[in-house]
Amino acid sequence: MKCVVIAAGYATRLGELTKNFPKPLLKIGEKSILGRMLDDIDQIPEIDEHVIITNHKFAPIFEEWIKANTDLTDNTEKNQSVQSEQSVVRYMKPITVVDDGTETNDTRLGAVCDLLYAMDKLQIDDDMLVVAADNLLFFSFQEFVDFAKEKGTSCIMCHEQPSIEKLQRTGVVELDADMKVLGMEEKPQVPKSHWAVPPFYIYQKQDLDLVRHSVENGCGKDAPGNLAHYMVEHTTMHAWPMSAGRFDIGSLDTYYEAIEKYGK
């Protein structure tokens, strides 16, 4: 299984903080957002490689971060913009950066096209754990992988969201008693359930042809949830109910809130 990190956006809502620096590498305390996530995912036996799909502007910064946090050599003379993280886990699985060639927010490919680009560039023909690297998570992805193995289908995550206003800004799924996905809507004005879908997915090898041809068959390009919505309509999918919470870092306010709550 490949872990594919979607990190090609330009995080314009964070202003100057991410004008020349990728949001996934912003630190919450001693660790970056991405570092916290990979510390967990790297421990999953099924994962054999991490793939970071990013843009041309930020690709060198990710490469520098990987070198700083995987080399066993002294890092004291490295560029101070990306430093070795304290208590760093030396990742056991290789990390590959894929550069999508874009340099501005206006020319971005969109999350779905970025995933397809990485799949084509690396000739990925394996199960994929696809994640957005702008969340702090309070559970292990191992639980999600185990759930997908048990169901034998591609899977999404879900969590109960009581706020109608928040449901109107995200993907919402209808489920049966076995957590099989019956339907999915993106940003519905009238949500049909309280099950919200965060940007974490498992696409199994048997469904990769559907993924590869999704955009040419009408799938939206911009948000990773567009692909999940498309896949729900074309194959059997199940939804894993998150066993604990997450913290979405989508703005300057939420970034500083994350530092205050979790960066000590």
PLM region descriptions:
Residues 61, 113-117, 143, 226-227, ...:
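Alpha-helical elements of Rossmann-like donor-binding domains used by nucleotide-donor carbohydrate transfer enzymes
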Residues 25, 173-175, 239:
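A structural signal for short hydrophobic beta-strand segments in well-ordered beta-sheet cores
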Residues 145-146, 180-248, 252-264:
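Catalytic-core segments of class I nucleotidyltransferases/pyrophosphorylases
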Residues 19-23:
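Short alpha-helical oligomerization interface
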